Curated annotation (Swiss-Prot):
Gene name linked to the record: nlaXM
Top EC class, one word: transferase
Molecular function terms from GO: DNA (cytosine-5-)-methyltransferase activity; DNA binding
The reaction(s) this protein catalyses: a 2'-deoxycytidine in DNA + S-adenosyl-L-methionine = a 5-methyl-2'-deoxycytidine in DNA + S-adenosyl-L-homocysteine + H(+)
Protein name as catalogued: Type II methyltransferase M.NlaX
Length: 313
């Protein structure tokens, strides 16, 4: 039985990926500060208790576990910290991950973040993180993976950090599955008319796109149809106007994707409950992870941990 903890849990996408990959995994602790995300998390995980602010949590209150998982927010590391030669991570949420790793020493961890972390502050932020993880005793692997390489029609890239306490572990990130994707795979047959954008909004998007093109800037919206291979990245801002992912509709204005489509775009099953408003749902799925990517990484982690365990026998 593998025990995991789910930090910065959001709606539980990382946990879901681990549960799909492991038949013998149990989440023993979850932490999430956003009350609406907690509502969705609890609706899908039996209403279990979710700890609030991890910065206020005593490590003594966190159960022992085998795997720490976290989709932690990317916060700029202080210049002072960088000048100290990676000595200071305090004041960032990464520090809370670090203090739990140091206190609990789980066998492994999986951290997820935006791809931009790789180049943030000319790469120094990632160097700070890696240095601290290594000083905590972990052998660390990093990779940027794309959702569309794992059967999901979304152009979403994220960086993943996987670490093992046992340096004999031989871990490899999963390879692309080689499956063609199509936006039609996630579309509902009969979406509600309320998701069709108004004439005023559509005219505004087109005008802005023309202005941006004339100014040599990128276009202002993303238009897709069932045959498109993939969409743009769904972000937490999607609830504002939905312009990054619009779906063509014959004979009328394009529409936003629906919350169930947003869930599918992150690889959540149709059985996943969405007990919150559309605005909160878009924010939650935009903030979440691509579940099939997590599952693929978790399967590789399980294989690596099992191989080391078998060698000990």
């Amino acid at each position: 039985m593998f025990k995991i903890i789910d930090l910065f849990a959001g709606i539980g996408g990382i946990r879901l990926g681990f549960e799909q990959a492991f038949d013998d995994v149990r989440c023993v602790f979850s932490s999430e500060i956003d009350k609406y995300a907690v509502q969705t998390y609890q609706a899908n995980h039996g209403g279990e208790t979710v700890c609030g602010d991890i910065t206020q949590t005593d490590v003594a209150d966190i159960p022992d576990h085998d795997i720490l998982s976290a989709g932690f927010p990317c916060q700029p590391f202080s210049q002072a910290g960088l000048k100290k030669g990676f000595a200071d991570t305090r004041g960032t949420l990464f520090f809370d991950i670090e203090r739990i790793l140091l206190a609990k020493k789980p066998q492994a961890f999986l951290l997820e973040n935006v791809k931009q972390l790789k180049g943030h502050d000319k790469g120094r932020t990632l160097q700070v993180i890696l240095a601290h993880l290594q000083q905590a005793g972990y052998k660390v692997y990093t990779e940027v993976l794309k959702a569309r390489d794992f059967g999901i029609p979304q152009n979403r890239e994220r960086i993943y950090l996987v670490g093992f306490l046992n340096h004999d572990v031989d871990f490899r990130f999963p390879q692309p599955i080689g499956q063609a994707t199509a936006v039609g795979d996630i579309l509902e047959a009969y979406p509600d008319e309320k998701y069709t954008i108004s004439d005023k909004l559509w005219q505004g998007y087109q005008r802005r796109k023309a202005e941006n093109r004339a100014a040599g800037k990128g276009f202002g919206y993303g238009l897709f149809n069932a045959e498109s291979a993939y969409t743009n990245t769904i972000s937490a801002r999607y609830y504002k106007d939905g312009s990054e992912i619009l779906i063509e509709q014959p004979g009328k204005n394009p529409r936003k994707i629906t919350p169930p489509e947003a869930a599918r775009l992150q690889g959540f099953p149709d059985s996943f409950q969405i007990p919150v408003s559309d605005a909160q749902a878009y924010r939650q799925f935009g903030n979440s992870v691509c579940v099939p990517v997590i599952r693929a990484i978790a399967e590789q982690m399980k294989a690596a941990l099992s191989a080391v365990s078998d060698r000990k026998v």
